């Protein structure tokens, strides 16, 4: 069967394409730009065209469109005119989950890392899982795979457009719940209501795994049989404390050693009302948020019967997904890291991880805010998001599918940030020049956002490298 995918360059739709290719289907697609995701698909035989035209639909049997594409899109209109079924991600998720054990990872933050960790744990256990991940994952080689149909299918269950409600998972994780996607969910109550519906779709509450550290996640679940996980330093000193009984999976004695994180894992036994040391783990990710992601993955893998050896091997091996604390390079003592963080909570967590790993560095942060709706709806949440940074620079808003005034929205956001050194730096080119000029040896430049703001870091590295080369030439 021939599938044509509109918006194939995105993480979610490229994952759909990989699964369809694994199943033996013909895949074509269209998007506005080429990237590493489309290059990988083209190497596998997908025919991708850049731009959008009715003729691109070709002889497709089915058309699949990203949620960001409206029904009036010219390729969707052409497909309907010709009687070609038009599907969304949710339709395929629903089809693929029939007759298969599904592990769904939902939540506002941490979905990509948690999903990838579970998939890697299953792989290291000798299972060939299927997976759909919303980010490039070098350790797995690809962001989606159909795998063995008899093995679990691990899905990053995106809540955008309520897509995750297409799933009735056997095991589900809710990493955290904080109001997001304000264009779909006009209020926090509507956002939480969608997660409540998702939680109810898990047949057995004992197979629902929830972050006990997050108030939003606890609110939307509320079932006493759900497994909870979290970080509890007191457990190392008093493992018999009744207060710890709320957590089924607990990380204690968390310590950071450069690029490595170590923690002890304690397990609460509900039958005996006691705790036991389950193991000691090391991973190549930093930050408390990544410890929580690891706990969620451990709980899911253990529920699936995966042994500690495979779990530990995957944790020690996993290098992270692209654009998740992604070290881009170092020039003249200046390190550049990029992260997808674009929500205030994600920014705080990423900054905390950066401070833990680079405690002596001056941290220069560039944020490219993402979408006008999110920027204006969350203005009051940004006040202390940058407290751990030394210098804060705010770029023009990346509009994505929206329209508005990028500079005005950036100024509105910057005006809410309680930081002694915050400025608006304009578009990507202007931001690059401004930030490159203030960087000095020993600095860490952290570029944040879900748009193309990563280019600031890449171009800064290039400019710094050229300046360094010129300096060396003049000295000789």
Swiss-Prot record:
The keyword ATP-binding applies. The keyword Cell wall biogenesis/degradation applies. Its EC number is 6.3.2.8. It comes from the Bacteria. One of its GO terms (biological process) is peptidoglycan biosynthetic process. Pathway: Cell wall biogenesis; peptidoglycan biosynthesis. GO terms for molecular function: ATP binding; UDP-N-acetylmuramate-L-alanine ligase activity. It catalyses: UDP-N-acetyl-alpha-D-muramate + L-alanine + ATP = UDP-N-acetyl-alpha-D-muramoyl-L-alanine + ADP + phosphate + H(+). InterPro entries: Mur-like_cat_sf, Mur_ligase_C, Mur_ligase_C_dom_sf, Mur_ligase_cen, Mur_ligase_N, MurCDEF_pg_biosynth, UDP-N-AcMur_Ala_ligase_MurC. HAMAP family: MurC (MF_00046). This is UDP-N-acetylmuramate--L-alanine ligase. It comes from Roseiflexus castenholzii (strain DSM 13941 / HLO8). The lineage of its organism: Bacteria, Bacillati, Chloroflexota, Chloroflexia, Chloroflexales. The gene is murC.
């Amino acid at each position: 069967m021939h599938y044509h995918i509109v918006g194939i360059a995105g993480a979610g739709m490229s994952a759909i394409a990989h699964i369809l290719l694994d199943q033996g289907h013909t895949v074509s697609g269209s998007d506005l730009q080429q990237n590493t995701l489309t290059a990988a698909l083209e190497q596998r035989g997908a025919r991708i065209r850049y731009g959008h035209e009715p003729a691109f639909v070709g002889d497709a049997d089915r058309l699949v469109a990203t949620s960001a594409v409206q029904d009036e899109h010219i390729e969707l209109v052409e497909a309907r005119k010709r009687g070609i079924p038009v599907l969304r991600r949710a339709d395929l998720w629903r089809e693929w989950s029939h007759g298969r054990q599904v592990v769904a990872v939902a939540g506002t933050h941490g979905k990509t890392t948690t999903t990838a960790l579970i998939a890697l744990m299953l792989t290291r256990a000798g299972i060939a899982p299927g997976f759909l991940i919303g980010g490039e994952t070098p350790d797995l080689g690809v962001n989606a795979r159909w795998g063995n149909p008899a093995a679990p299918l691990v899905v990053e269950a995106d809540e955008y457009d309520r897509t995750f409600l297409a799933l009735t998972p056997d095991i589900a994780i809710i990493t955290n719940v904080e109001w997001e996607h304000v264009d779909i969910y006009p209020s926090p109550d509507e956002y939480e209501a969608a997660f409540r519906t998702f939680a109810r779709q898990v047949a057995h509450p004992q197979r629902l795994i929830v972050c006990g550290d997050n108030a939003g996640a606890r609110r939307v679940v509320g079932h006493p049989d759900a497994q909870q996980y979290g970080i509890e330093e007191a457990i190392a000193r008093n493992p018999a404390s009744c207060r710890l009984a709320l957590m089924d999976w607990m990380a204690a004695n968390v310590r950071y050693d450069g690029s490595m994180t170590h923690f002890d894992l304690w397990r609460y036994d509900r039958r005996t009302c006691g705790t036991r040391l389950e193991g000691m783990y090391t991973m190549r990710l930093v930050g408390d948020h990544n410890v929580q992601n690891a706990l969620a993955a451990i709980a899911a893998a253990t529920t699936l019967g995966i042994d500690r050896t495979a779990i530990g091997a995957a944790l020690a091996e996993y290098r992270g997904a692209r654009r998740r604390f992604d070290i881009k390079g170092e020039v003249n003592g200046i390190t550049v890291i990029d992260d997808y963080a674009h929500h205030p909570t994600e920014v705080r967590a990423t900054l905390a991880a950066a401070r833990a790993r680079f405690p002596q560095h001056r941290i220069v942060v560039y944020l490219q805010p993402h979408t006008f709706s999110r920027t204006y709806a969350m203005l009051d949440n940004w006040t202390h998001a940058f407290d751990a940074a030394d210098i804060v620079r705010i770029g023009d808003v990346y509009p994505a599918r929206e329209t508005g005034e990028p500079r005005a929205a950036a100024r509105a956001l910057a005006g809410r940030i309680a930081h002694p050194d915050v400025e608006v730096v304009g578009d990507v080119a202007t931001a690059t020049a401004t930030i490159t000029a203030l960087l000095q040896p020993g600095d860490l430049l952290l570029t944040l956002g879900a748009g193309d703001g990563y280019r600031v870091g890449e171009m800064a590295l290039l400019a710094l490298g050229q300046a360094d080369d010129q300096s060396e030439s003049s000295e000789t």
